């Protein structure tokens, strides 16, 4: 088993990043690959978890040790696999997730991707009182109010009309939040990120 890899991020796609360690490129499936865009071609430390299946060996990557622990807690729940766990983490609401589990808020939990009522109930049963530490870093973050960025909204709507998936665009939009640019430049930058 591996704890983390330290290497150069050589590639970013919509679903994974490639981390080059000692001339070997490892595919790491991560919750939000575009969050690593600022580190492209730079050294990064990524926490990892290996999943061995009959047909594949997969590596999942995490920005922090806490994020990795949350992932491990989620996949311990019956009905939640690695892909679903990553989708939940990608929603970027770890504090809300932990709070909903502690308060047994089934309705809130079903708002997360791929989580139905039965799985939400299982999450409460299995994780209540166990995931506070994993969620605490997210809880400590002060909420940031971002002003409406009309240019960014226009760019995302245009790309949606071009046929790009909403899930991919959501990740890209999150990366650009807090910046100011023209819709045209946002589209150009987003296209570069999508083709890498």
Curated annotation (Swiss-Prot):
Region (Flexible linker): 143-146
UniProt function note: The RuvA-RuvB-RuvC complex processes Holliday junction (HJ) DNA during genetic recombination and DNA repair, while the RuvA-RuvB complex plays an important role in the rescue of blocked DNA replication forks via replication fork reversal (RFR). RuvA specifically binds to HJ cruciform DNA, conferring on it an open structure. The RuvB hexamer acts as an ATP-dependent pump, pulling dsDNA into and through the RuvAB complex. HJ branch migration allows RuvC to scan DNA until it finds its consensus sequence, where it cleaves and resolves the cruciform DNA.
UniProt region (Domain III), positions on chain: 147-196
GO biological process terms on file: DNA recombination; DNA repair
Main location: cytoplasm
HAMAP family: DNA_HJ_migration_RuvA
Source taxonomy: Bacteria, Bacillati, Bacillota, Bacilli, Lactobacillales
SMART domains for the chain: HhH1 (SM00278)
Entry protein name: Holliday junction branch migration complex subunit RuvA
Name of the coding gene: ruvA
Domain notes: Has three domains with a flexible linker between the domains II and III and assumes an 'L' shape. Domain III is highly mobile and contacts RuvB.
Record keywords, A-Z: Cytoplasm, DNA damage, DNA recombination, DNA repair, DNA-binding
């Amino acid at each position: 088993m591996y704890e983390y890899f330290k290497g150069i991020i050589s590639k970013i796609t919509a679903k994974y990043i490639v981390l080059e360690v000692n001339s070997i490129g490892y595919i790491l499936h991560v919750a939000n690959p575009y969050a690593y865009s600022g580190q492209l071609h730079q050294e990064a430390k990524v926490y990892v978890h290996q999943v061995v299946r009959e047909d594949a060996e997969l590596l999942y990557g995490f920005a922090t040790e806490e994020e990795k622990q949350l992932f491990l807690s989620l996949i311990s729940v019956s009905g939640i696999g690695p892909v679903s766990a990553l989708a939940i983490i990608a929603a970027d609401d770890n504090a809300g997730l932990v709070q909903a589990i502690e308060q047994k808020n089934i309705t809130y939990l079903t708002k997360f991707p791929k989580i139905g009522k039965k799985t939400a109930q299982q999450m409460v049963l299995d994780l209540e009182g166990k995931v506070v530490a994993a969620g605490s870093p997210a809880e400590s973050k002060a909420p940031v109010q971002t002003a409406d960025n009309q240019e960014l909204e226009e760019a995302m709507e245009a790309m949606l009309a071009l046929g790009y998936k909403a899930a991919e665009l959501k990740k890209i939009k999150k990366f650009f939040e807090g910046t100011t640019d023209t819709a045209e430049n946002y589209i150009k930058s987003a296209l570069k990120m999508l083709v890498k």
